[in-house]
């Protein structure tokens, strides 16, 4: 019996395709909204928060403080899998995804209402920190469910990489929407953007969350999870069980993402502070280039996912690691010319090598875990990378540049991350084109 057969009535091919299509749309739209919520903060951090909430005579110190609060959201992200991974493996993917969408959206809208330092002093920064933690928890619980919602509806084993990559499009699309919203209101004259214009993109989250909820409420639970219910394979404490039974996979999943997380946040966050403060680039140039890059990246993600189905997850990922390690030096060399056209080209192209990794990793990580522990295990491993790589990357980059007055150390830092990721990919089992819907595939786990 296949996973679809776990439903009370056996679905026709037409019904199955309709459910698959709706699940992919729901997961992709949902992750786009959640990443918009999380990344609008990232974009505005480099443009506004250092000045508005951490006014310091030294712009580098102000930027470091702002990036410190930015990093707090990443430290909170592993809490999301502990909470929502537990319920995702116990009550299902659907209900959990509705909860994560609400949590992140409400916190994001609240950020747009926080007064600046001139009004409430240091409390503005404190409130931002609390809201950033809530954002991090919501986003941390989102990823695993979204990927599984799409991947676990696959009828064959030959296109799981492609299906699992669709929720990954949410990151570049969310970044694109965040940049577009900031760019749109960035045309405000004088200090209007700094005073109030930046708040509107955060408040728009309320509308986007409403759309996401409408889509997600109508989806069915995945056949793989439905089968776990039918076979009575639900764990009482899935988070504890996955740490006990598959700790190696959790650690490797976290280390695997270093090559994607570190350069990803250098390209999408650090570049705004580096470009405006040290290169004298206009905010609109950086935003326009980033928007172009996210559009290119959105198209590239499913291509990378499909490539992982064809040549294997591991091979695709290693190619991506090599691309990132080589491109980081070209990237900073082009930015260093201060020629607007070359700077635009560097930023726009920077998303391609990162999205190669992003498109392959969803299936590579998720397939490493047995179905009854998959939401918890994949989510914990995935989000641990946010603490050790993604969150610290802008902070480390700013510190390295301040200490050495050169971008070469930043490039070396990215190369080290890429090497670690290659080793992790080599050690993580590749389940390309193998049936991962059955518990027996994973032995005595």
Spans of features found by a protein language model:
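Multi-pass alpha-helical transporter architecture, strongest
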Residues: 212-219, 416-445
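Glycine-rich segments within core transmembrane alpha-helices of 12-TM secondary carriers
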Residues: 161-186, 381-393
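Extracytoplasmic gate region of multi-pass secondary transporters
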Residues: 42-43, 247-296, 389-394
């Amino acid at each position: 019996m296949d996973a679809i057969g776990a439903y009370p009535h056996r679905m026709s091919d037409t019904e199955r395709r309709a459910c698959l299509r709706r699940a992919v749309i729901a997961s992709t739209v949902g992750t786009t909204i959640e990443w918009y919520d999380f990344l609008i903060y990232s974009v505005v951090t480099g443009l506004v928060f250092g000045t508005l909430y951490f006014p310091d005579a030294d712009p580098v110190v102000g930027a470091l403080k702002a990036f410190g609060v930015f990093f707090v959201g990443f430290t909170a992200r592993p809490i999301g899998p502990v909470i929502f991974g537990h319920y995702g493996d116990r009550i299902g993917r659907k209900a959990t995804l509705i909860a994560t969408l609400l949590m992140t959206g409400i916190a994001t809208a609240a950020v747009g209402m926080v007064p600046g330092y001139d009004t409430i002093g240091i409390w503005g920064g404190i409130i931002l920190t609390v809201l950033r933690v809530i954002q991090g928890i919501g986003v941390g619980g989102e990823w695993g469910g979204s990927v599984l919602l799409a991947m676990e509806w696959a009828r064959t084993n030959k296109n799981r990489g492609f299906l699992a990559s669709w929720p990954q499009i949410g990151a570049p699309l969310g970044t694109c929407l965040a940049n577009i919203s900031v760019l749109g209101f960035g045309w405000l004259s004088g200090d209007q953007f700094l005073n109030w214009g930046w708040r509107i993109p955060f408040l728009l989250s309320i509308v986007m969350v409403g759309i996401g909820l409408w889509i997600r409420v109508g989806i069915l639970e995945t056949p793989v999870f439905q089968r776990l219910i039918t076979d009575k394979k639900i764990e009482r404490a899935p988070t504890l069980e996955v740490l006990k039974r598959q700790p190696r996979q959790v650690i490797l999943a976290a280390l695997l993402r270093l090559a994607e997380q570190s350069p990803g946040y250098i390209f999408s966050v650090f570049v705004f502070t580096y470009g405006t403060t040290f290169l004298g680039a206009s905010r609109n140039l950086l935003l326009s280039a980033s928007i172009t890059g996210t559009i290119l990246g959105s198209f590239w993600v499913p291509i990378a996912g499909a490539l992982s189905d064809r040549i294997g997850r591991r091979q695709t990922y290693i190619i991506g690691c090599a691309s990132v390690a080589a491109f980081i030096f070209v990237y900073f060399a082009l930015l260093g010319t201060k020629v607007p056209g070359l700077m635009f080209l560097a930023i726009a192209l920077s998303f391609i090598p990162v999205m190669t990794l992003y498109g392959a990793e969803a299936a590579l990580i998720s397939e490493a875990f047995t179905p009854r522990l998959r939401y918890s295990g994949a989510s914990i491993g995935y989000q641990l990378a946010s603490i050790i790589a993604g969150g610290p990357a802008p902070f480390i980059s700013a510190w390295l540049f301040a200490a050495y007055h050169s971008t070469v150390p930043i490039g070396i830092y990215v190369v080290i991350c890429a090497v670690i990721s290659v080793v992790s990919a080599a050690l993580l089992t590749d389940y390309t084109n193998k049936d991962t819907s059955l518990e027996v595939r994973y032995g005595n786990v």
